[in-house]
Amino acid sequence: MKLIISGGGTGGHIFPAVAIANEVRRRHPEAEILFVGANGRMEMTRVPDAGYKIVGLDITGLQRRLTPQNLMFPVRVFRAVRKAGKLIEEFRPDAVVGVGGYASAPVLLAATSRAIPSLIQEQNSYAGLVNKLLAKRVNRICVAYDGMEKFFPADKLVLTGNPVRSEISLGDRSAALHFFGLDPSKQTLLVVGGSLGARTLNQATAAALTRLQEAGIQLLWQTGKLYFPEARQQADQAAGLHALEFIQRMDLAYAAADVVISRAGALSVSELCLTGKACILVPSPNVAEDHQTKNALALVSKGAAVLITDEHAPARLYDEALRLLSDPERQQQLSLRVRELARPDATVTIVDELLKLVRK
């Protein structure tokens, strides 16, 4: 069996793609799996780290304003589709999976034009433009939220949930506290700005460090690369405040946390559901169709999360966080409700659908 998985750009696309590949390889150890990403993006290093080969396309997204790069966009797309077509003809995959990100569209266009079975994995509650355009061409669309028939043909939809790393919910709290050097007698707040960081969360957290100390709250703070030097300097001045550029052991970070502050990317939301963590979501305003707000509202509408807008975060985020940290009953209520939304078998179900296409 040969499989191409295309897409990337952020952890929210890369980690589900790797989870799908791992499940395919678990069932079919002989499978040949090739990733296709965008040159210069995160997947070009993260995918090889996970043990898979990746090939890069020279493709970027459209800018929101008129730029010279936008004028070249059609040329780049044409070249990327042509290169993707050559890759497909050389590799001869039995199926192609698109997980979103710049490289996903050229590969799916090339695959569907050659009648190769194709599957889209849409992570968000609001479908992106590219996936909506590709929907008529692909064979199957795996989604994470109810109501997606307003974007896609209903006969192609399968409600699966999002693939999440299987170990993410297996962290042991005692081991986690020891790993991060945290005090078991104190509450722990985890702040995660996504794999690329988040300026609003970082600035609000930096401004609240004294308040957290005074309240006896411990902090695990994933800053992203750009803010890390400043955050480390600030956090090093106080006990119990830990700034990290990137948290490799998210299973232990979730296990240690009593409350989580996070962006509302699809992967983050799925992980919070699976780990059952009381959470405050601050959707990024810098995403297509404001899809993070829609992801967050899917939880908030069921009483499973708190939402603070990016605009209001500087003034309100840590007032709300400290209230929640001081209210164990509310933490437990949010935890129970968010866990009800988890789909722990998402990866298995997606690979089931993929293998059905291969066997046809």
Question: Predicted regions span which residues?
Answer:
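Short hydrophobic beta-strand element within catalytic cores of glycosyltransferases
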Residues: 262, 278-289
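A short, well-ordered alpha-helix in the C-terminal region of glycosyltransferases
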Residues: 330-344
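C-terminal alpha-helical cap of glycosyltransferases
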Residues: 343-360
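Acidic donor-binding loop of glycosyltransferase active sites
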Residues: 93-95, 247, 255-270, 277-278
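Conserved nucleotide-sugar phosphate-binding/catalytic loop shared by glycosyltransferases and other
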Residues: 3-10, 30-79, 227, 309-311
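Glycosyltransferases and closely related glycan-assembly transferases
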Residues: 85-96, 104-119, 132-137
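Active-site-proximal region of nucleotide-activated glycan assembly enzymes
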Residues: 53, 112-174
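Donor-nucleotide binding loops and adjacent catalytic segments primarily
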Residues: 41, 46, 50, 173-178, ...
